[in-house]
Amino acid sequence: MTALSWMLAVFLATSSPPDPGASPRSTARAYLEAVLRGDAGSALALVADPSDADRFVVRAHAASADALRRLEDVATSRFGARGDLGIAARHRRLLASLDHAPLEVSGDRAVLHPEGGKPIRLRRVLGKWKVESPAERLTGEEQRALERTLKETEAAAQDLAGQIRARAVKSAEEAREALRKALGQVQQEGVPL
């Protein structure tokens, strides 16, 4: 083995991603990454004893994130860099907020406080950190609103993607405005999940 290949092997061995359950922060990050890429199964694997309500909430968030990501993919394929709808940028900001969020650890329990978001509660289960009930972070009204929003988001994303493919939407600005209008948004930076 040459010195270069040995150094490369050492680098690769030491630069592997952290075990998702190794710390509260790495667990919360792995959970959010899974949700944002639309992978409800991987996200649910990081939830402590998921209830039916947890499964619904995680699947809803993952489906919404996936629909919006696919819409942005269609917009960027049609309009190039101008087709950026702010969705990927919002996802990056959400992940970055976890990296800097204050963390409280008390024994086998932890709470991460991301700026501008609800606290993420975690607990250690058999030596691994897991996200506590995502559904409990929502009130009953918020759960009902999530269900409505999911349906609206998926329908709006599919409809707008179809319009972009059919060239009925003429510009990236028109696509962003149509998405904001469909989702009832007036903000300039991205769209919420």
Residue spans for each PLM region:
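C-terminal region of N-terminal signal peptides and the immediate post-cleavage residues
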Residues: 13-18
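Terminal "cap-and-tail" regions of soluble proteins that handle hydrophobic small molecules
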Residues: 151-193
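Regular secondary-structure segments
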Residues: 28-36, 180-183, 187
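Short beta-strand edge/turn micro-motifs at domain boundaries
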Residues: 109-113, 117-153, 157, 190
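C-terminal or late-domain output modules
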Residues: 49, 123, 136-141, 160-171
